[in-house]
Structures are given as structure tokens and as C-alpha cells.
Amino acid sequence: MRPSTDTMEADTAATHRNFITKVDVPDHAHYTVAFFVSVIGTLGVTGNALVQFAFYSNKKLRNLPNYFIMNQAASDFLMAFTQSPFFFINCLNREWIFGELGCKLYAFLGALFGITSMINLLAISLDRYMVITRPLEAMKWNSKRRTTIAILLVWLYSLAWSLAPLVGWSSYIPEGLRTSCTWDYVTYTASNRSYTMMLCCFVFFIPLAIISYCYLFMFLAIRKTSRDVERLGIQVRKSTIIRQKSIRTEWKLAKIAFVVIVVYVLSWSPYACVTMISWSGHANILSPYSKTVPAVIAKASTIYNPFIYAIIHQKYRKTLADKVPCLRFLAPNKRKDCTSSSFSGSSYRDSVISRTSTAIRRQSTAASRHASASKTAAGASSYSSSDRVFGDVEMDPIDWRSGASFRRHSSRGSTRRDRLLKKQQMERTNKSAAHKQPSPSTKMSATHCKNKTVSSSVNMAAAPPQLVLIRKRSQSLTNGLSDAGKKTTVANGTPGNHKSKSADLHFRNLPALDQALNVPRIIVISPTSEDCLVKHESSFTDDGSVGTVVDEDSLEDNDVV
């Protein structure tokens, strides 16, 4: 028993010396590695924490494909959080100071999170492959429950490979500058060689081959769909176009994953090469630097994904810019001022329309009451016939750019309207001298209808107009049109079935005037019957915009156009 005990003690002492043995390298080599490890740890922890924060704070980002991205960020975060601090402290001490148990725990966590990242990228590739090449099957299988199960399987698969060295299949030992630990790929034994080969195949090479296969066929599927659309041209079915758009959307997510995979593979490739060199029996040609540098590069794979998302993923950038004030430079909103101005202008117009509509309803109610009172006082005989006033209106387009420019245009046109109104009043006075005065009840009804016409005209002008009244082309054309089938006499004594010559002349000349002036014209009919209804018509300009009829009297009583 004594020799065996001595042998065990000797092995324990050798193992302890193996953990505390320093490598004969300059101190600045340790400090240089410590600097890079600290940078990697800081960026890895901060960047992946921001990725998780962005995806958890924005509901639009919490979709099924992004579950794998969040899992990737969680794995990289834990990798940086558990590896960098211990690595940094050991580099400052120039040796491993946490003992054998600490070395095994450190190596176990590093293997667990590293393998999880690689297998998770494989799961992302398979998910994109199914969605793009087999969309119907993907719709049946994609669900929150199945995605959660897939992520759980990724972790279980990684856990199995990480636990193997702890149960006797290979082992965890210090590597490189003796400031970090990993599985024993240096010792040339059957156990170590078999574990190294199986690990490299089932964790690195086979997943990489499957990823390459998935992206190759994704690319071919997208190219085939694009060629089908180009070949069919306008005869392409709507379902084909929708499918092409859906595939292109999924391809954008696949491209992000592809960039992540490429960066990850490039980070771990040097470490895989060193491992295979040792497995082939040429570990003696590897220096401590050639073992440590690939390990640092592999751990740097945790910092790339946040930068990739910040560059490519637009929603991720916008979410961080909205949630984190110091990161607003990621998504500068150049159109914010324009959008605010547009909203304020629209709100202003809506408020004007609302206020004008309320005023019109009040005036309409008052006009109806006065019309009813006039009807009772004068009798129904006074309203046996309806007098209609015909007039054409010429409208000119203006530029609706700002409220200030619009008010300036209205103020310039007010002087011109005053002159036209004075001229019309003089003509009406001359005409009224040759005809009898209408009854008081008729005057009151006409006044109420005129007020209602003015209010309705203001309502039409309150909306964003493209045409504004600048002058009125004609006067009242008739005073004596009567209802069909009735032989009545109006106030001036002319027969009820007699038509005004000026009206006939006016309607004959309307097409010629439109063609000559190339100006849209419209007739405003203002009935003076007992219902006091006003019809507003709209004219369409050549470019499809709507022109609204505006009464000149309304412009005198109201400043809002």
C-alpha cells in the first residue's frame, strides 16, 4: 500500500506543479494579453446586454426567428462574463491562481458557452432554410413551443460535450501561458485524441458543413424565384409575387445570420487548427504564444454580434436609439421636423374645419327658424315660385405652402373683391330701378339663404383648398323663372314660362368661355324657396385636384379660407 500511496502523492504533486508552473515569457506578454482580454470582456458584456435589452423591450423584435438571436446573445454574454475576469486576473499574476477546481470550472463554462454558440448558429441556419425553401412545412412546424424546445436541445447538446472531460473522457488543464484552461488536446493519449476528434467533428466541422449546405440552397431558391418572376413578367400570379416578397424578407434575416456565422467561424478557425495540429502528434512545435493567441481570438467572437446587429439590423438600431439616450446617433431622425410640421399643419386645418362646421350648423338652424316664421307671416302664396340665381365662378390655382403665404394672397385679393362688389352693387341698383321691389317676406327668405350660402362656402374653403375665388364673371341672370306646368306671374309682371334672354345668352357662351380661358367654371344655384337648401358642387382640375366654390360674400365676413 505504501508504494501506491507514494505514487498518488507524486501524481498529485505533479498535477499541482502543472497548475502553478509559470511559463518563461516576458511580463509584458502577460500584460498585453490582459489588456486585450479586458477589452473583449467589457465589449462582450456590454454589447450582448444591449442586444438582450433591445429584443426584450421591443415587442416587434420578439418574434420566433429572433428567439435564436436572443439565445446567441445570452450565450455570448455568459461567455464574456465568466471567462474574461478570471483570464484577466491570471494574466496580471502571470500564472493560474484559482487551483485545479477553478481551472475545471473555468474550462467547463468556456466549453459550454462556446459550443452553445456554434450549435445555436446551426439552429438559425436550419430555421432560415425551412422558411425559405419549404415555407408550407415551416408554417406547420414553427411555433413558440417548438422554438423553445429547439433552444433547450441546443443547450443540452452543449452540456453533454462539456461534461465529458469531467467524467473521465479527456480532462481540463491550463493552456498557453498558463493563465487559462481548456480540454487537454496536447497530451497524446487515446482518451484525449478521441475526444478531440469527436469534438471537432460534431461541434465544428459537421455543423459548418450543414450551415454551408443550408445557405447554398437558400441562395438557389431565391435566385429561382427571381428568375421565374422575370420570365413570367406581367403574367406572374399574385401569389408568386407575395411569395417572392416573403422570401426576400426572410433572406434579409438569413443574411444577418450568415454574417454572424462567418465571423464566428473565422474566430474559432485558428483555435481549431491548433487543436488538429496537436491531435496529429505535433504538439511540440506549438509555442505558448501559438496556443494563447488563438484562444484570445476565439473568446473575441462574443463581441462581434452586437456590432453586426447595429450595422445591419435597422429595428435593433432604432430600438437602442429610442431606449438609450447616449445611443441616439445609431438612428438619427432627419425627418422629425418635417413630420412634426406636417402633423401640426394637418391639425390646424382639422381644427379650422371643425370650428367652421359648428358655426354653419348654428347658422343653418337660425336660418330655418326665420324661414318658418316668414312663411307663417306672409302665407304660402308668396313661395309658390322659386327664384334661382345663376352665376359662374372663375378660379385660379394657388400654392398651398404655408398659412402665411395663403393669408397674404387673401389680403391682396381683398381690394380687388371690394372693387368688384361695388361694381356689382351699382349694376344691381340700376336693374332694381326698372323692376318692382319684391315682398318683405321674399327679402327675408333670400337673406337667410344667402347667409347659409356664405356659411357653407366658408366650410368648403376651410379645408386645404387648391383653388381660390379671385373674381366673379357674371351677375344675376334672371328674376323670373317659374315652375313647370304653372302659369304664374312674378313681381315684375313677366309670364312665368318666359325665360330670360340673358340666361340663354349666358348658357350659350359658357362652353366658348371655358375653351377660350381654359379655366374650370361652375354654376352655383342658390334657391330662395322655403327649404333654403344650398348645393355645393366641386370642379376637378386637369391634374385631378378638386376645386371648391367659394362665395365672395363669405370672404368678406370670414378671414379663414
Curated annotation (Swiss-Prot):
**A Pfam family reported for this protein in Swiss-Prot or TrEMBL:** 7tm_1
Compartments it resides in: Cell membrane
MF terms from GO for this chain are:
G protein-coupled receptor activity; photoreceptor activity
What is the topology of this protein in the membrane according to its UniProt annotation?
A: Multi-pass membrane protein
Instruction: Using the UniProt annotation, give all residue ranges assigned to the region (Disordered).
Output: 359-385, 404-448, 479-503, 539-561
Q: Which cysteines are joined by disulfide bonds?
A: 103-181
Please list every transmembrane segment annotated in the UniProt record, as residue ranges.
35-55, 69-89, 105-125, 149-169, 202-222, 256-276, 292-312
Q: What is this protein called?
A: Melanopsin-A
Q: Which domain of life is it from?
A: Eukaryota
Q: Does the keyword Repeat apply?
A: no
